[in-house]
Curated annotation (Swiss-Prot):
It comes from Yarrowia lipolytica (strain CLIB 122 / E 150). This is Arginine biosynthesis bifunctional protein ArgJ, mitochondrial. The record marks A210, T211 as: Cleavage. This protein may be expected to contain an N-terminal transit peptide but none has been predicted. It is found in: Mitochondrion matrix. It is an enzyme of class 2 (transferase). Substrate binds at T174, K200, T211, E297, N426, T431. The lineage of its organism: Eukaryota, Fungi, Dikarya, Ascomycota, Saccharomycotina.
Length: 431
């Protein structure tokens, strides 16, 4: 049984340690930290995460499409509109309370967080320079006095080392069993840059961007408009291509800050270097978002759904999403049941252009061994049940679907299985 206390990543679950970095290289000019303020009951569980840049950043974000948008989502959208994504210095996140469906009082609380962060970390103009996020139980007001006090008291303790970044990742966790943090260096031309990203999520995960909370920071000099385009492109192929349970949160937000501290020419949408940066951000986002699936509530498997030879990338993505979100497919995976009829059923009701006599479905093992074909051009194969059982016993596996349209367009989607433990975790969420 996976024991998930509220914000359970203080003790990383056995087997998940390999996903937690022991070191990292982080972007210049940022200080971060994770702290306890009293929003959560247990003092060992951090509930405040802060990131601040020494100099103003260009910023972009993608938000939930749930109509019940949480207060911080509404506040952040207005801030990015009025600032046009320029002059942002700080991101403050509280965990333990979502500040969602909290009325005008919740909006006021989020605004108070912005004002306090601006007072503590400074603003270069009269416009707001801070963004805020919240995650936790919906429908409850923030313990705003504790949060405001925590922002002021803990700001001097923020640092730029690995431990500080890891604590920041811990500070945004709820039912996560491990903190999700990544960093990497990359080159564009003669310049070397660094990007760091952290995210949280294990349940209420489904693409409608964003699918969870997270933020990126880079010392590359990227314009605000270019950052927005690159982040949307990256999110559609990463955070919008994962699902744990099919539920889209009220609080979903991904923010990206670029402070340009590493120097070099500005990267704009028309720069020759822009496609390079966009590809780097997309790959980085994809790897980071997959950690959320690996930590899916009650999950025992990490599953990649690959759809090939569709008429368009959008149609391939929709077919992959439909299969990934099918409860019957997900429970069959948990039961190690090679019931490919459930996969085909989901493909058929995806609403996309599918020709049954051209469709092929296979299990692709991740150990390098040969694939197991289940259906070829609409004709069922004689499935080796023992071989199927071997593949389904693996933690990682791939379901490959070839639509045979001749269009040559592909898409990937990542999901996990549904277990008894998912019901237990969510049945006990508030207790």
């Amino acid at each position: 049984m996976q024991v998930r206390h509220f914000s359970s990543c203080r003790i990383v679950q056995a087997g998940k340690e390999r996903f937690v970095p022991s070191s990292g290289t982080y972007p210049k000019g940022f200080k971060v930290g994770g702290f306890f303020t009293g929003v959560k009951k247990n003092a060992f569980n951090m509930d405040l995460a802060m990131l601040s840049s020494d100099k103003p950043c260009n910023a972009a974000a993608v938000f939930t499409t749930n109509v019940f948008k949480a207060a911080p989502v509404q506040v952040d959208r207005k801030i990015l509109d009025v600032t046009q994504g320029k002059g942002i210095k700080t991101v403050v996140v509280n965990s333990g309370c979502a500040n969602a469906v909290t009325g005008e009082g919740g909006i006021h609380d989020a605004q108070q967080m912005v004002k306090k962060a601006d007072q503590v970390f400074g603003s270069e103009s009269d416009l707001p320079a801070s963004l805020v996020m919240s995650t936790g139980v919906i429908g409850q007001r923030l313990k705003i006095d504790k949060i405001l006090k925590g922002i002021e008291e803990h700001a001097p303790a923020m640092k730029d080392d690995h431990e500080a970044w890891l604590n920041t990742a811990k500070g945004i966790c709820t039912t996560d069993t491990f903190p999700k943090l990544m960093s990497q260096q990359f080159k564009i031309g003669d310049n070397t840059y660094t990007i760091a990203g952290l995210t949280k999520g294990a349940g209420m995960i489904h693409p409608r961007m964003a699918t969870l909370l997270g933020f990126f920071a880079t010392d590359a000099p990227v314009s605000a408009s270019a950052l927005g385009v690159a982040l949307k492109h990256a999110a559609d192929r990463s955070f919008n291509a994962i699902s744990v349970d099919g539920d889209t949160s009220t609080n979903d937000t991904i923010v990206c800050l670029a402070n340009g501290a590493a120097g070099g020419p500005e990267i704009t949408e028309t720069s020759a270097s822009f496609p390079v940066f966009q590809d780097i951000l997309t790959d980085f986002s994809s790897r980071l978002s997959q950690l959320v699936v690996r930590d899916g509530e009650g999950a025992t498997k990490f599953v990649k759904i690959s759809v090939n030879d569709a008429v368009s990338e959008q149609e391939a993505a929709k077919v992959a999403e439909t299969v990934a979100c099918s409860p019957l497919v997900k429970t069959a995976l948990y039961g190690k049941d090679a019931n490919w009829g459930r996969i085909l059923c989901a493909v058929g009701y995806s609403g996309m252009q599918v020709e049954p006599t051209k469709t092929t479905v296979s299990f692709m093992p991740t150990d390098g061994s040969s694939e197991l074909k289940l259906l070829v051009n609409g004709e069922p194969e004689q499935v080796d049940e023992a071989r199927a059982s071997e593949i389904l016993d693996m933690e990682d596996l791939e379901i490959q679907i070839n639509l045979g349209t001749g269009g040559g367009k592909n898409a990937n989607f990542w999901t996990c299985d549904f277990s008894h433990e998912y019901v237990t975790i969510n049945g006990d969420y508030r207790t």
